Structure formats: C-alpha cells, structure tokens
Design a protein with these regions (language model features):
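Bacterial Sec-dependent N-terminal signal peptides
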Residues: 1-23
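Acidic, small-residue rich beta-repeat scaffolds with periodic aromatic anchors
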Residues: 22-24, 107-179
Length: 179
C-alpha cells in the first residue's frame, strides 16, 4: 500500500511539474505567433505578469480571424500560469479602415492594462479598452471602453465616445466583447 501511494504521489508530482510553463512562448497556440506583449505586476503579487496578443499565422489584411488576448501571471517558482483569455477584445486586422490594422499598443500601469486602437480614413478614430485587476475577487473586470473621433479636415473638432458604459466595473474580462 505504501509503495502504491508513493508511485501515485510521484506521478502526480511529475505531471504537475511538466504542466507548468516556463516561458511566455509556451502559451502560444498552434498556428499563432505573438503580435505584441507587455509586462508589469498586474495582480500586485511582486511577480512579473504579461499581457500577450496572438495573431494567426495565416492572417491576411482582409481576414477577420480571432486575435486572442492572454493574461499570464508570473508565479513564485519562476513559472507562468494562464490567468485569462479572451478572443473578442482585439479588433481584427481589417477593422482599421484605410489605416489598416487598428491595433496600436498594450499599456500596463499598476493593476490596470489597456489595449489601444487607431484607424479610419477621412474620419479618424481611436479606442482604448481598459481592464482592472480586482484584488478582492482576484479577477479582471472592464474598467473603461472609450475613444474619440475626428474628421481629418477638422482635427480640432473631436467627438468623444463611451462604449458599453453600463458594463464598466461590472463585466468580467473573459466575457467582454469589443463589438
């Protein structure tokens, strides 16, 4: 009985050891590559966390393929853990109009991260979607989704837009859609 318990314990230990990811690249899905990544201490635990945006390797300018956004938390033992994934936040490559790919940047500050977009033609627009890590619930929620737009011939006449304001500080990261 003791030998059997030792074998089971060893198998469980080795399985969990090999399941841990030691590199951000270990989270890249088959057929995808990293479009962008940014690091910071999102969950305020003292370890480096990452926001990673993936792109489909077969993505073309006209494609409307998903661009997964991954939240990856650094762990005490030097490994990484997937804390969240959402395929509906990063706008498609063709969604930027004449400007092409609207994706602009990821920014991280404290326990917030934002995904920034810019696009348009004569009518230009920007959009910033921000999420906040809630240290009590240990989850990410939508903090703000807003942007601005202007006509290229009248750049001083800026219009401000709030998207899904009724969901701010309520909807979880995993279920939010930028549509």
């Amino acid at each position: 009985m003791k030998l059997r318990s030792t074998i089971i314990f060893t198998l469980l230990l080795s399985t969990s050891f090999f399941a841990q990811k030691k590199s951000i690249d270990d989270f890249v899905l088959k057929g995808y590559s990293i479009l962008d990544k940014s690091s910071g201490d999102l969950n305020q635990d003292g370890y480096t966390d990452y926001i990673v945006i993936l792109r489909n390797n077969l993505d073309t300018i006209s494609a409307d393929t998903a661009r997964p956004l991954l939240i990856i938390h650094g762990q005490q033992n030097g490994t990484y853990k997937l804390a969240g994934r959402n395929d509906s936040i990063v706008l498609c490559k063709a969604c930027g109009g004449v400007f092409g790919d609207p994706y602009s940047a990821i920014t991280i500050k404290d326990n917030y991260f934002s995904v920034e977009f810019y696009g348009g033609s004569n009518w230009r627009w920007s959009r910033v979607i921000t999420f906040k890590y809630n240290t009590i619930t240990k989850s990410y929620i939508l903090h703000k989704d807003a942007g601005e737009s202007f006509n290229a011939f009248e750049p001083d006449k800026i219009e401000y837009e709030s998207y899904h304001k009724e969901l701010w500080n309520k909807i979880p990261f995993k279920t939010y859609s930028a549509d």
